[in-house]
Amino acid sequence: MVKYIYEHNNWPDFTWNDKDINAVFGEVRLIQGKIIGQMNALGFSAKAEATLSALTSDVVKSSEIEGELLNYDQVRSSIARRLGINTAGLVASSRHIEGIVEMMLDATQRYTLPLTEKRLFGWHAALFPTGYSGPYAIETGRYRTGEMQVVSGAIGKEKVHYEAVKSELVKQEMDKFLDWFNNENRLDPVLKSAIAHFWFIIIHPFDDGTGRIARAITDMLRACAEGSGE
């Protein structure tokens, strides 16, 4: 019987091929350097507008991955207000969008702060302010207490592709993850963000929103690596 990755004795001791990934990291660093150089060359107003556009696209695209289409103008307006950017055409934003923006900005603007259980719970509660995901009530602001499976197929003919860590082990697994996240400083930040994203998804600690929070964690490490929330 095939074991899931977290069932192996060496979990979560990740390994990788330095030769393969170093070439990729070199390309990433080159692109990062070009972008940072271009941003530094901009005037204050142009830089603020570029930052606003980049952050807005980040939020919108992240939600699109989950099949959710957010109103671009509402997202843009919410970010502009929170960052104190004066721009024309601000509109009111829904409570749901405000929560998503709040999480993203907390991750990218306060990236020097530790990632804690309390902080993750706050992000999760912000994503689901009503306690519902669509028409379904979910557990918010805490780890899931039920099982989590990735399933496809019609009712009665379901195929289970993946079953996440048992709910009673989520707290234990997350404690390991958070300890590593806050204390592992030897890894290249790009590699660390990749491992963090994968590790978090494997645990799948929440009823819903795990993917969006995983991408916020990745953004947090990216901002830390660049020394900027832009």
What residue ranges belong to the model's regions?
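FIC/Doc superfamily catalytic core
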Residues: 1-230
